[in-house]
């Protein structure tokens, strides 16, 4: 089952967890790959279920964990306590904005 759908891409909860874990591991060791994860400022004003400083990390439709190069359109958002805030995408958004995955 899809835990999040970004455009036509279905993400399982395990795929989301894997992306979040990889992103948070880099964040917690003050490391990054191709400038990810980086702080996500929520200019779009999403009503996330957790608070804190947010970070974005790519989630890939291939199911692989992001290790650099093209990040694609989709991002997992987590906070500095490693709590999942949501999954968002550039797909269907104008310019460099994001919309929520459903």
From Swiss-Prot:
InterPro entries reported in the protein's UniProt record: N1-like, Ribonuclease/ribotoxin, Ribonuclease_N1/T1
Residues forming the catalytic site: 38, 56 (proton acceptor), 90 (proton donor)
Top-level enzyme category: lyase
GO molecular function: lyase activity; ribonuclease T1 activity; RNA binding; RNA endonuclease activity
Enzyme Commission number: 4.6.1.24
Pfam families linked: Ribonuclease
Annotated keywords: Disulfide bond, Endonuclease, Hydrolase, Lyase, Nuclease
Catalytic activity: [RNA] containing guanosine + H2O = an [RNA fragment]-3'-guanosine-3'-phosphate + a 5'-hydroxy-ribonucleotide-3'-[RNA fragment]
Disulfide bonds: 2-10, 6-101
Family: Belongs to the ribonuclease N1/T1 family.
PANTHER family: EXTRACELLULAR GUANYL-SPECIFIC RIBONUCLEASE RNTA (AFU_ORTHOLOGUE AFUA_4G03230)
Protein name: Guanyl-specific ribonuclease Pb1
């Amino acid at each position: 089952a899809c835990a999040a759908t970004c455009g036509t891409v279905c993400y399982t909860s395990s795929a989301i967890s894997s992306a979040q874990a990889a992103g948070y591991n880099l964040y917690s060791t003050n490391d990054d790959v191709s400038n990810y994860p980086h702080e996500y400022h929520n200019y779009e004003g999403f009503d996330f279920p957790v608070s804190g400083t947010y970070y974005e990390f790519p989630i890939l439709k291939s199911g692989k964990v992001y290790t650099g190069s093209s990040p694609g359109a989709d991002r997992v958002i987590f906070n500095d306590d490693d709590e999942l805030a949501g999954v968002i995408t550039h797909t269907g958004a104008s310019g460099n904005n994001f919309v929520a995955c459903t």
